[in-house]
Amino acid sequence: MPGKLTGSSPTTTAKMKCGAVIVAAGRGERLKNTTPKAFIPLRSKPLCQYSLDAFLSYPKITDIVLVIPEEKLSSFSDPKFKVVAGGASRQESVFKGLSALECDTAWVFVHDAARPLLTADLLDRLWESAKNGKNCIAAWPISDTVKLAQNTTIAKTLDRQNLWGAQTPQVFLTSVLKDAYAKAKKDNFTGTDEASLVERLGASVELVVGDPWNLKITTPQDLKLAELILENKL
């Protein structure tokens, strides 16, 4: 049975434990590269290494699970984090990572390794919201005019004033996210992010202002842009 969606937030030291699931099992066909996306080099480091470094250096995170393609399992051997094989879909991969967290992990940060420019400032903003028992995601207000299309014809212009682009990390009470995955499996539902699963439980999810540079690497152009951003930061 699903647990309660609301209630007192964890207060003891044991219950303040935070974990992170870094999803790095995607193939990245749109990058036109035979290497799994998270292992494509960005300034000489694998893409997933940037997210790993961000979470390893963030003191509130005590349990990290990296989810990667099965054939890459031998690429990492480090006692500071766990490595598990991904599933057939992103949703299955996140669930495998979630299942590998220590059982007393109260909160979980779920992050796409395809977003390598994660900062400690963004992690701080998310934790400030999450530590009071809230579920929250990083997001950025949409500035473009958004068209709802039917095939290639405009069906409607949406009011962008209330539209946000979801990012990661997304942070949840671990018990709530597990309940959300149980319901999704029961209903045979596939969502595009974790928040969409939690929303189906009736649980609230807060938007935390993300970072305009927290881009998702999807195309070769995105990879080049990330390189330029890193060059200017260094």
Please annotate each region the language model reported.
Residues 73-80, 148:
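Short loop/helix-cap segments at secondary-structure boundaries that form the rim of catalytic
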Residues 90-153, 167:
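Conserved beta-loop-beta/alpha segment of the NTase-like Rossmann-fold superfamily
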Residues 1-9:
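Short, positively charged low-complexity motifs
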